[in-house]
């Protein structure tokens, strides 16, 4: 079918961090990696954290629910995010790694390490790596009851 007359295809507008950056200078963003045991989020923002540049989860990359938190899904998500960052002009990332935290587990899920590795392997420079898992100072009672979880 021929394209309609008078209807020009829309051109996708690409934001660039162009002229204000010198050659060879790194443009930083912040990669917030949230790795629970059910899913892995890779969310890149600007340095202030207000403007989202890309956000991809493990669940967006695989079909089976059980694979959402897998290292493979996290790797695919991180590769997608890296491609989007390069389009915009971000060349380096500070990484903020987070587990579920609070009164739940403080250990990052299986996708955390592979997401970080995939970002580095896809050409992004890594600045600082910081653990921002929420640590309770005093909180509500943990799940499991008085005698704890019986295995």
Swiss-Prot record:
Pfam families: Ribosomal_S11 (PF00411)
Keywords: Ribonucleoprotein, Ribosomal protein
SUPFAM superfamilies in the cross-refs: Translational machinery components
A single MF term (Gene Ontology): structural constituent of ribosome
Record field: transmembrane: none
This protein's record includes keyword Ribosomal protein: yes
Keyword Mitochondrion listed: no
NCBIfam families hit by this protein: PRK09607.1
Family, similarity comment: Belongs to the universal ribosomal protein uS11 family.
Protein's UniProt name: Small ribosomal subunit protein uS11
Gene name for this UniProt entry: RPS14
